Amino acid sequence: MEQPQEEAPEVREEEEKEEVAEAEGAPELNGGPQHALPSSSYTDLSRSSSPPSLLDQLQMGCDGASCGSLNMECRVCGDKASGFHYGVHACEGCKGFFRRTIRMKLEYEKCERSCKIQKKNRNKCQYCRFQKCLALGMSHNAIRFGRMPEAEKRKLVAGLTANEGSQYNPQVADLKAFSKHIYNAYLKNFNMTKKKARSILTGKASHTAPFVIHDIETLWQAEKGLVWKQLVNGLPPYKEISVHVFYRCQCTTVETVRELTEFAKSIPSFSSLFLNDQVTLLKYGVHEAIFAMLASIVNKDGLLVANGSGFVTREFLRSLRKPFSDIIEPKFEFAVKFNALELDDSDLALFIAAIILCGDRPGLMNVPRVEAIQDTILRALEFHLQANHPDAQYLFPKLLQKMADLRQLVTEHAQMMQRIKKTETETSLHPLLQEIYKDMY
């Protein structure tokens, strides 16, 4: 068999530039940043003439450190890894080499020297390079965990809980590094973690107990500085109580959308997707993620607000007039069941990432690419749950069902928002939320 000494430069360059070209070739989204709806219909919550749209937020401050860079070495040659490819972290060159070898069924002249594969010499011995790819576990089937043989699956899961001194498993190490990266991004971008919220709700936190809001009087005490630093911008101090609470919810939602956008930009490969696809994933995913995270600050009696400074009772929210009283109750019901799964923040980080990178969202341009990213996240989530909850045998399928439950919850919520927009003529929706709800379901 012929033993090629060098990869063709033009082929190699094509492979290495492939993903970059895809990102740079992303089309404008319906006219670019001007796509955000005008704020003239919403003066209570935003005095800005042009509040940031989802596209604007995606394009803000995105650099290599904040946009999903793992800063990991390629397992094959030691070059900088561009992502998780065929089951291991690999650079663009080794990813392309492995793909070409498999697709074209190339056979290389056998080498007995066990050549050391490094960035500077990786093209010298293709046989040893391919053998190293195989030894590290690179495989077309590695994209989807479900296609792996059961024996291999059990071996990988066992590796998660193995002692530090045990035999090194590159696939497990890559998934651990991936999970850690997602968890660190979660801690960096979200002000309220579940750990912090539960310590406040159970009275174990060191700071002052939250101020309890249970009626109109305590709400206005909270607004005067006990909980919130300032009133909602432009909101008259004695506007109808139900509308005021609705506006407060919108303020919190908009801030959480901003946090989720930054978190999404930290997920490996998210920022290399078409901008149109990034916007679509956020449009359909943020509310599912918000309602999943809402469970962290909820117990059966109420929920934390203002970063834990206040606690609004469930009964007070039920006392609001319809349709506003109907908004939060289904979220309480979901939260109580979701909290029974006893997830921690490291579990939630991967779960939220899997929600955002969902390949069946309407209007996606590159479905296979999104599905491949989500497959990696789900694989990492399943491994992580096996290690973090060894006695919870069915936790992973239960979480997949919760993803379906969240989709139904958001569908009903979006429909409710559209009804409020039509029937409550004195009530406005924030422009960013209008953009999200428009033509949603």
From Swiss-Prot:
**Which residue ranges have biased composition labelled Low complexity?**
37-54
Sorted alphabetically, the Gene Ontology cellular component annotations on this record are: chromatin; nucleoplasm; nucleus
Per the record, the zinc finger regions (NR C4-type) lie at 74-94, 111-133
Question: CDD domains, per this entry?
Answer: NR_DBD_Ppar (cd06965), NR_LBD_PPAR (cd06932)
Protein's cellular compartments: Nucleus
Query: Which coarse location class describes where this protein primarily resides?
Result: nucleus
Q: Where is the composition biased (Acidic residues)?
A: 1-22
Give an example GO molecular function. Answer: sequence-specific double-stranded DNA binding
Q: In which tissues is it expressed?
A: Ubiquitous with maximal levels in placenta and skeletal muscle.
Q: Where is this region: Disordered?
A: 1-54
Q: What does this protein do?
A: Ligand-activated transcription factor key mediator of energy metabolism in adipose tissues. Receptor that binds peroxisome proliferators such as hypolipidemic drugs and fatty acids. Has a preference for poly-unsaturated fatty acids, such as gamma-linoleic acid and eicosapentanoic acid. Once activated by a ligand, the receptor binds to promoter elements of target genes. Regulates the peroxisomal beta-oxidation pathway of fatty acids. Functions as transcription activator for the acyl-CoA oxidase gene. Decreases expression of NPC1L1 once activated by a ligand.
Q: What is this protein called?
A: Peroxisome proliferator-activated receptor delta
Q: What are the top taxonomic ranks of the organism?
A: Eukaryota, Metazoa, Chordata, Craniata, Vertebrata
Gene name per UniProt:
PPARD
